[in-house]
Amino acid sequence: MLTTRDLMTEDLIALRHDDTLLAAKQTMEEARIRHLPIVDEAGAFVGLLTHRDLLAASVSGLAEIDTQTQEDIYAGIPLREVMRSDVAMATPDLPLRQAAEVLLTQKYGCLPVVEGGKLVGILTASDFIRLSLELMDALEASERLECAAEEE
């Protein structure tokens, strides 16, 4: 049986809850990610910031505020004020099917993977898409082998 550990990303980018919205914005843009786990000083998982959360906390483009002023505003907002703390989580041993069901119902697009209170990985919808592609490749290869065997 596949578990969350088999598919999760362990090479994580995370910020601390006292980092700023500006740091989160820059990190998400540079790393091209949509989900940013947030940890405390001890490395314990405390929340999640999504791209949608970032947009909700951002200054509207309709406001006539220059870029530097916007960045100054973002630099004064700690992540603990805008992050989601009521986030569904998974353990590394959670069956992958259950993790998929949680992703579908929670609609966050990711599941932080926590063990002993510490963030150890993240499971995203993209991970499941990659798995689906691998399974389709394996199925197609199997079908080609069956066809070749039938022709002999």
What is each of the regions a protein language model found here?
Residues 15-32, 38-39, 89-107, 114, ...:
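The conserved cystathionine-beta-synthase
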